[in-house]
């Protein structure tokens, strides 16, 4: 029935074979078809851009997005999985600009917006085939055929509906505001897009400028770190309650006003100036001054060039006086509140000075710093120049510095729905949970209005038409509405097409669309509605699949997709758009840096898959901290370790079963009796059923970390305890009931383990299942139900007993290893000490297991350590310090004098009284720290409630017995080297060695049974293989198959 398993296995090749099996037999499609009509489990797939190839950062969420839908499908749910593509926005435009070697609004418009958008359309799906191939090779099942694209007209129309709905609710407004702006992209960004980028430590010039007070020969010393904003200076700010000094500078022969606390920074010697007057900032509020540049003198009549008070002014740095220009949010707000000045912005779309600033016309603002400084020097207005190190935001798409500038933009009014957003967040199950109140919760608490317009070209146009005469606005929510108002047929909603659509206004003038396009995050946030063409299609069914049961993406999406989904879900329906979310962290290179193609600091992901297999990579990722939203320092060695320590041991367990099942012609049936008599069988079956229970509970809670931990723990139990301790049951020649029970139990364990592992490592489990399944079972492992526990087979008492024994064995083995006593060398006695009567009972019941595992002749179970150790004691200062005070030292000395008998009494619960002068102190066990000293020939270890001792004295008989085990190992190795089958009987040839003859004479039967040897013969001519016993005894052996 079973097919032979090759000893040398190439896992990537197996995976490719399985992939072909899935595709040829349409297994994914069948898994969907068999769940049609079942309860829906709604999953949203966050759309990636296809302008770049998938990398490790994509592999993490894609693995998670495969595990949960596979699991839910096996649990009987219908899980639609449609892939989506983010096709609009800055990333696409930036790629096209690079390929066309053009830059900025002017060059794009010169090239032609229609041609530019066509290029965007052509490039946007450049890597879709590579994405499909890579994601499929990772093992993810997802429907690429019925994908959605944000550039599809149906998708775009639904986004218009979302916009119009918010607009009609009064949640969208247009305003002039200071926003972070990307000069290279020539568009504003939202505040959360700024956080998607990087803040870098940069050096900027720090200037102290002399501003002359109007009609006086006195100067304000104002500070700035943005020299390029000085041409647009419209005011100066001081702190209302800050102390200022008017001083006379003896060297410069000039009078200055400066923050009093800052005098020491500018004047190291107070003899170089004289204080004329001191006052609060409030005292000079409203005073007029002369601007350093005269470009905008006309603004004086509107309130410019006056001193204002501001809360943000401090004396931590600078002069305590700052210059104000409309290129910062706080500056802008002061000018808006206290003046009627025009919001002058003499810079173009690429942030170059216009002809309004004639001295610096055409210069990029940051490049103008040095020329402005030189100009100030020539005018004798530069008081001091320094360098200022500070953190500055960079564009997340172009990696260039952002500029804060006033600009007209469209906003979603977040302030109006903030409390509802916080309420929506309460409905979400976050994995990890700390994100609810932490990163995401705090982001919502401090959320600001969302700038949703972009001064770009390739995007979903803002559907607002404005009357050229009256300024009246009409917001459009569908193609049909636009066609009705304009009288024109609409096929494509992109900017280059619909900007041509105008219509006359009843008031005179023409309705023309506002020029901006929507932030692509608005589109991805609209994905639940737009991917279904809601509300234009299946409107009545939509709320059956909204909100999503599950989504998964990276930590950065707490300020991206998760955020926009929550905003739009709350704004539209006053509920969250998703119920459960697993958030992964960043995948970094092994040195902790960001993965970079230019740095070549990571291996190509496909090379990793082709070397180690997708299963190993998937398991490596979901075992790591990255699924807990922590960072992962990726390494190929980590994937290699998973292959070595998990994938191969699973295969070895499977290979072991198949090898012996073929030999004994074992054939399973569907009516395996699971009520076994062998304690190992009972135990492993109980562990299987407990694992089923735990996995169903934990995966239902989206706790992948706990699920993986439990699976790996079981694999260890199966391989390193059940199979290892059951080997002889498979080796023996007779097919008795015990042997059949062993086969049935291992078969049951393996098949159920594969079913439980299937969502995590779909390739290996499929390969193994195909050989294990009976002819009447499902075609694929992934068409099966997820295993549910059989409660009556769970024996918690037995599991606890066996786990205690495994713990004892582990401690004892560690003790042997720490003293270099090989496990093959038998010892005479193991002592196990525990005061717990239940533990003593377990040890007594299972002592044969311990004797075998520890390779000991005898076991002695004790309730105290007297036979193993003598004691010394030290004072527990932490416990005694507060009680004893000044007598601490004296009591500590007395404790050190306690003899073994005194300490034993304390261990047994008695108090020991110590008298110091007129004081007596009762010392108990918690007051002392025990030191154990091993008795002669004993090696002792203590862990928790258990102390273990080994008698290390090796007699000649024990020595020879140990050598016999080494001989067995050498013979087994020789069998493997000669490619003997595990069932082959052999003749063992040995050379004429005295020690070897001693070993054979005492342990011949044991050696024969363990090596399937039917005859042992001294034959120097056939014993040709040299081997060492105990690293020092050189012998020769040889083997032949028994042919009689």
Swiss-Prot record:
This is Isoleucine--tRNA ligase. A motif ('KMSKS' region) lies at residues 594-598. The keyword Flavoprotein does not apply. The gene is ileS. Monomer. Its cofactor is Zn(2+). Belongs to the class-I aminoacyl-tRNA synthetase family. IleS type 2 subfamily. It catalyses: tRNA(Ile) + L-isoleucine + ATP = L-isoleucyl-tRNA(Ile) + AMP + diphosphate. InterPro entries: aa-tRNA-synth_Ia, Anticodon_Ile_ABEc, Ile-tRNA-ligase, Ile-tRNA-ligase_type2, M/V/L/I-tRNA-synth_anticd-bd, Rossmann-like_a/b/a_fold, tRNAsynth_Ia_anticodon-bd, Val/Leu/Ile-tRNA-synth_edit. Pfam families: Anticodon_1, DUF5915, tRNA-synt_1. IleRS has two distinct active sites: one for aminoacylation and one for editing. The misactivated valine is translocated from the active site to the editing site, which sterically excludes the correctly activated isoleucine. The single editing site contains two valyl binding pockets, one specific for each substrate (Val-AMP or Val-tRNA(Ile)). Keywords: Aminoacyl-tRNA synthetase, ATP-binding, Cytoplasm, Ligase, Metal-binding, Nucleotide-binding, Protein biosynthesis, Zinc. ATP binds at residue 597. It is found in: Cytoplasm. Catalyzes the attachment of isoleucine to tRNA(Ile). As IleRS can inadvertently accommodate and process structurally similar amino acids such as valine, to avoid such errors it has two additional distinct tRNA(Ile)-dependent editing activities. One activity is designated as 'pretransfer' editing and involves the hydrolysis of activated Val-AMP. The other activity is designated 'posttransfer' editing and involves deacylation of mischarged Val-tRNA(Ile). One of its GO terms (cellular component) is cytoplasm. It comes from the Bacteria. It is an enzyme of class 6 (ligase). One of its GO terms (molecular function) is aminoacyl-tRNA deacylase activity.
């Amino acid at each position: 029935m079973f097919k032979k398993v090759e000893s040398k296995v190439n896992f990537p090749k197996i995976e490719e074979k399985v992939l072909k099996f899935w595709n040829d037999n349409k297994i994914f499609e069948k898994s969907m078809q068999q769940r049609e009509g079942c309860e829906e489990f709604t999953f949203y797939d966050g759309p990636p851009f296809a302008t770049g190839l998938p990398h490790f950062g994509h592999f993490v969420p894609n693995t998670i997005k495969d595990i949960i839908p596979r699991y839910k499908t096996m649990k009987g749910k219908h899980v639609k999985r449609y892939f989506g593509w983010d096709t609009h926005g800055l990333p696409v435009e930036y790629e096209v600009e690079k390929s066309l070697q053009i830059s900025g609004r002017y060059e794009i418009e010169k090239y032609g917006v229609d041609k530019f958008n066509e290029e965007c359309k052509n490039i946007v799906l450049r890597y879709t085939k590579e994405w499909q191939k890579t994601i499929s090779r990772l093992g993810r099942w997802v429907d690429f055929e019925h994908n959605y694209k944000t550039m599809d007209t149906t998708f775009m129309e639904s986004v218009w509906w979302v916009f119009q709905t918010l607009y009609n609710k009064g949640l969208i407004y247009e305003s002039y505001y200071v926003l972070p702006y990307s000069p290279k992209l020539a568009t504003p960004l939202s505040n959360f897009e700024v956080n998607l980028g990087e803040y870098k430590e940069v050096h900027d010039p720090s200037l102290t400028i002399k501003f002359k007070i109007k009609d006086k020969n006195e100067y304000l010393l104002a500070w700035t770190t943005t020299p390029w904003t000085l041409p647009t200076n419209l005011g100066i700010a001081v702190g209302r309650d800050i102390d200022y000094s008017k001083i006379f500078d003896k060297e410069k022969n000039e009078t200055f006003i400066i923050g009093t606390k800052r005098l020491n920074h500018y004047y190291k010697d107070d003899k170089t100036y004289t204080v004329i007057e001191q006052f609060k900032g409030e005292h000079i509020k409203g005073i007029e001054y002369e601007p350093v540049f005269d470009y905008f003198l006309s603004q004086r009549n509107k309130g410019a060039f006056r001193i204002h008070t501001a809360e943000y002014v401090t004396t931590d740095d600078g002069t305590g006086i700052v210059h104000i220009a409309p290129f910062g949010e706080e500056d802008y707000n002061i000018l808006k509140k206290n003046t009627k000045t025009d919001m002058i912005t003499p810079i173009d779309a690429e942030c170059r000075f216009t002809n309004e600033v004639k001295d610096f016309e055409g210069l990029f603002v940051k490049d103008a710093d040095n020329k402005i400084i030189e100009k100030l020097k020539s005018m004798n207005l530069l008081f001091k120049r320094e360098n200022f190190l500070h953190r500055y935001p960079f564009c997340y798409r172009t990696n260039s510095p952002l500029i804060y500038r006033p600009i007209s933009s469209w906003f979603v009014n977040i302030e109006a729905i903030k409390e509802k957003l916080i309420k929506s967040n309460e409905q979400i199950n976050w994995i990890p949970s700390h994100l609810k109140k932490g990163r995401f919760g705090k982001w919502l608490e401090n959320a600001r209005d969302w700038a949703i317009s972009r001064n770009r070209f390739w995007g979903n146009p803002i559907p607002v038409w404005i009357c050229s005469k009256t300024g009246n606005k009409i917001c459009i929510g569908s193609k049909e509405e636009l066609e009705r108002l304009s009288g024109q047929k609409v096929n494509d909603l992109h900017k280059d097409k619909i900007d041509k659509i105008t219509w006359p206004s009843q008031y005179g003038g023409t309705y023309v669309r506002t020029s901006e396009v929507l932030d692509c995050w608005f589109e991805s946030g609209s994905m639940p509605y737009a991917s279904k063409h809601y509300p234009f299609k299946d409107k009545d069914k939509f709320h059956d699949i909204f909100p999503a049961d599950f989504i998964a993406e990276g930590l950065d999406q707490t300020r991206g997709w998760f955020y926009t989904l929550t905003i739009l879900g709350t704004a539209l329906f006053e509920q969250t758009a998703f119920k459960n979310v697993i958030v992964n962290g960043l995948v970094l290179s092994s040195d902790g840096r960001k993965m970079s193609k230019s740095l070549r600091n990571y291996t190509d992901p496909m090379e990793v898959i082709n070397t180690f297999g997708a299963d190993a990579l998937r398991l490596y990722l979901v075992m790591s901290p990255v699924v807990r939203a922590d960072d992962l320092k990726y390494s190929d060695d980590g994937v290699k370790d998973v292959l070595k320590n998990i994938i191969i041991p699973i295969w070895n367990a499977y290979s072991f079963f198949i090898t012996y099942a073929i030999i004994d012609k074992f054939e399973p049936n569907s009516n395996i009796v699971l009520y076994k008599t062998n304690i190992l069988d009972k135990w492993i079956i109980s562990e299987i059923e407990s694992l089923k229970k735990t996995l169903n509970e934990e995966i239902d809670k989206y706790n992948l970390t706990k699920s993986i931990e439990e699976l790996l723990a079981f694999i260890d139990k199966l391989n390193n305890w059940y199979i290892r301790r059951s080997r002889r049951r498979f080796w023996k020649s007779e097919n008795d009931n015990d042997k059949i029970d062993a086969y049935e139990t291992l078969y049951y364990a393996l098949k159920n383990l594969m079913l439980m592992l299937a969502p995590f490592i779909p390739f290996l489990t499929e390969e193994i299942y195909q050989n294990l399944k009976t002819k009447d079972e499902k075609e694929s492992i992934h068409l099966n139900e997820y295993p549910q526990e059989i409660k009556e087979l769970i024996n918690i008492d037995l599991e606890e007993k066996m786990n205690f024994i495994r713990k004892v064995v582990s401690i004892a083995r560690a003790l042997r290893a720490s003293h270099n006593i090989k496990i093959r060398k038998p010892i005479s006695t193991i002592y196990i000490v525990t005061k717990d009567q239940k533990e003593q009972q377990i040890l007594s019941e299972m002592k044969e297991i311990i004797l075998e595992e520890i390779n000991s002749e005898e076991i002695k179970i004790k309730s105290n350590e007297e036979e193993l150790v003598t004691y010394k004691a030290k004072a527990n200062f932490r416990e005694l310090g507060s009680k004893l005070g000044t007598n601490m030292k004296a009591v500590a000395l007395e404790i050190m004098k306690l003899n073994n008998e005194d300490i034993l009494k304390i261990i047994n619960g008695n108090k020991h009284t110590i008298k110091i002068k007129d004081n007596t102190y009762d010392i108990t066990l918690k007051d002392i720290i025990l030191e154990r000293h091993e008795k002669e020939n004993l090696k002792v270890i203590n862990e928790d409630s258990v102390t273990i001792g080994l008698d290390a004295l090796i007699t000649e008989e024990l020595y020879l017995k140990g050598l016999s085990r080494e001989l067995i190992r050498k013979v087994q190795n020789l069998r493997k080297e000669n490619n003997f089958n595990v069932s082959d009987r052999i003749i063992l040839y040995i050379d004429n060695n005295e020690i070897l003859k001693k070993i054979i004479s005492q342990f011949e039967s044991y050696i024969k049974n363990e090596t399937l040897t039917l005859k042992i013969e001294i034959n120097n001519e056939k014993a040709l293989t040299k081997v060492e016993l105990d690293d020092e005894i050189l012998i020769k052996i040889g083997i032949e198959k028994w042919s009689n």
